[in-house]
């Protein structure tokens, strides 16, 4: 499965869809080679609590961004995130790697009344909702890239996330 996923992620149509901001899940449904891909789910036991860790890939302002979103056993509450990038601007979009940005995802939820809401970034320090975090000042495009990346990948995992344990 790992090789199949790596091959699928190198698909030029998928790469273009990510750059164009198209939903990854739509691209996967339309591409027979991608439709059969099983996306990895890592399971961790942290202090006796199960955490589900999902990899994510996307596009920032200047290139690829990627990361992991970890969910509590309820598959709704974010335990934590980790993001990185290839070439975002230092002091701006590159701040996605900093604790001040990543910590604000903890405790956020991705569902509302059984509907996947993912997490949105808000400009100007106005993030107050259960599904919102503050964007990086001066790094709006990269912040929006992280939002899109998380949303696209959570859609790919939606069936798994809705499964009851």
Segments the model singles out, each with a brief description of its role:
Residues 1-165:
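Flexible, solvent-exposed loop/hinge segments and secondary-structure transition points
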